[in-house]
Amino acid sequence: LSQPHKKPQCVVVGTYAPHFPYIAPTELYDKYRMRTDLPPTLDIMASAQDAGRLRDTTPELVKGVRAAYWGLIEFEDLCLGQVKSAWDTYLSRHGKRGIFFYLSDHGDHAGDRGFYGKQSLYEAAVRIPMIVSGDGILAGNRLRSPVSLLDAAPTVCQLAGARELPFQDGVSLIPDLERGEEREDRAVTAEWINLPYGRGTDYGRMIRQGKWKLISYVSHPEEELLICPDSDPWELYNRIAEFPEAADELREAAFHNVCAGRIVEEK
C-alpha cells in the first residue's frame, strides 16, 4: 500500500487470532482476568454428539480461557485498526474509492457448555462479525436479518463491477449495505460434520429464519433443538415441543436437496 498501483487493488489480510491456544498479551489478559464472568451454560452438558470434545473444566480454567480470548479479540482490533489506517491512507493519497470488509470463519465456545473451539451449531461457534465500511456504505447501520459467509463473494463481485459468479448460494448484500434494506424472511444455514470419539460419523445442520433457529443431527434426531436466539441468547430452552410446526417447516427447508444419509455413509 506504500506504492502506487494503476490497477484496482484487492488486499486480503488473514490473521490467526483470536483462536486457540488461548495466549494473549499479558497486559490484555490481566485487563480481562478480573472482569470476566462465567457463562450461565458452564454446568450445562453439551449434547451427546458433542460429548467427545469435552475437556476438564473448572471455573478458574474457564475464567482464564475467556480472559485470554477477550484479550485476543482486543489485540485483533488493534491490528485491524492498523490495517484499516494504512488502507485509508492509500485511498486518500491516490484519490481512490474503496471498501473495507471484515469477517471471520467461526467463533469459539471458550468453556461454554464445557468445551472449547468451534465444531458446534450453537451461536458461540456459528455467529461471527461481518463489518463493511467505505464509499457508498451506509455508516452506523446494523442489519438485524441473518447474513451468511456465502454472501461475501457475490457482494465483493458486485462492488468491483465483476461478472456474477455462477451457481451462487449466497446473495449480494449491496441493497442491505447501501440502503439498509432488511431481508426479514431470509433463511441462512450452516452445516457440521464430525467423527466423534467412538460414536461414528455424524452430520448436523442449522437453519436460522425469522425468530427461530433449528439445529438437527442426522444420527441423533432426539437431540433436535428449536431455539429463539433473540429472547434466549444463551440457547437454554428447547421450544420444539411447543412449536412442532415451526420445527417441521425449518427442517424441510434445512435439508432440502441435502443427501444427509449419504454424507454420513461416505464420511
Task: Write out the residue ranges for each language-model feature.
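Hydrophobic residues within well-ordered, non-membrane alpha-helices that form the packing/core
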Residues: L1, K84-W87, L177, A254, ...
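Active-site-proximal cap/lid insertion segments
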Residues: L1-P146, L159-F167, V218-H220, E245-D248
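Short, amphipathic alpha-helical "lid/cap" segments that border enzyme active or binding sites
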Residues: D77, L150-A153, R251
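C-terminal cap/loop subdomain of S1 sulfatases and analogous C-terminal strand-loop tails that border
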Residues: H106-D112, D151-A153, Q158-P229, A246, ...
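Active-site-proximal N-terminal segment of extracellular/periplasmic enzymes that hydrolyze or transfer
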Residues: Y237-P244
